[in-house]
Amino acid sequence: EITKFPKDQQNLIGQG
């Protein structure tokens, strides 16, 4: 899980 942005981590999975 990419947790660069805890705010929208589930939305940014694969984008980070």
From Swiss-Prot:
Keyword annotations of the record: Lectin, Manganese
GO MF term list: D-glucose binding; manganese ion binding
Temperature dependence: Active up to 60 degrees Celsius.
Domain of life: Eukaryota
pH dependence (UniProt free text): Optimum pH is 8.0-9.0.
A biological process from GO: cell-cell adhesion
Function: Glucose-specific lectin.
Subunit-level organization: Monomer.
Entry's family note: Belongs to the leguminous lectin family.
Note: Requires manganese but not calcium ions for cell-agglutinating activity.
Record-given protein name: Lectin
Organism field: Delonix regia (Royal poinciana)
